[in-house]
UniProtKB/Swiss-Prot annotation:
GO biological process, one term: L-tryptophan biosynthetic process
Function: Part of a heterotetrameric complex that catalyzes the two-step biosynthesis of anthranilate, an intermediate in the biosynthesis of L-tryptophan. In the first step, the glutamine-binding beta subunit (TrpG) of anthranilate synthase (AS) provides the glutamine amidotransferase activity which generates ammonia as a substrate that, along with chorismate, is used in the second step, catalyzed by the large alpha subunit of AS (TrpE) to produce anthranilate. In the absence of TrpG, TrpE can synthesize anthranilate directly from chorismate and high concentrations of ammonia.
Keyword Amino-acid biosynthesis in annotation: yes
Entry-linked CDD domains: GATase1_Anthranilate_Synthase (cd01743)
Annotated binding of L-glutamine, by residue: 50-52, 81, 128-129
Species per Swiss-Prot/TrEMBL record: Lactococcus lactis subsp. lactis (strain IL1403) (Streptococcus lactis)
Descriptive protein name: Anthranilate synthase component 2
Amino acid sequence: MILIIDNYDSFTYNLVQYVGVLTDVAVVKNDDDSLGNMAEKADALIFSPGPGWPADAGKMETLIQQFAGQKPILGICLGFQAIVEVFGGKLRLAHQVMHGKNSQVRQTSGNLIFNHLPSKFLVMRYHSIVMDEAVALPDFAITAVATDDGEIMAIENEKEQIYGLQFHPESIGTLDGMTMIENFVNQVNENKESSNEK
């Protein structure tokens, strides 16, 4: 089962639909009392988009700290920003607010989430906060940037299976979004098969 942590965002149920086509999925709010127990039982965690700054989003950052390296983690928009903060990066306000705007994204290095995708592709962006490129994020590769404003759009810690996307794969405006979610789910399923063989 993949657990989606809902950061009180309208896009969360798009994510639930995408993941639910591929595997068992559960969803719980970021401040729900059952969150810790649900996360323990899950095979992987997806942190949804949401409003505001990640430090204000319930138990999200605590959960990332707790389960990093134990379960695959995918952070989307606010979830991406939480990963950045938890692992020592910095956030800043974007030079240009992106609410419902398409951008072309260019891959800068390999990323499991982008398997079977072209080197450039269109994504949908809804955010006013970005990762500060001036502050290093140890153990993470920057795997995609926006071609229009140069902002960081994706990060990956391959060893720990932690992936962050600043854009919205669950939006209809991200044409290859379902492929990205499928790539993550496939990784989760491979982990389960490997552990069953041990």
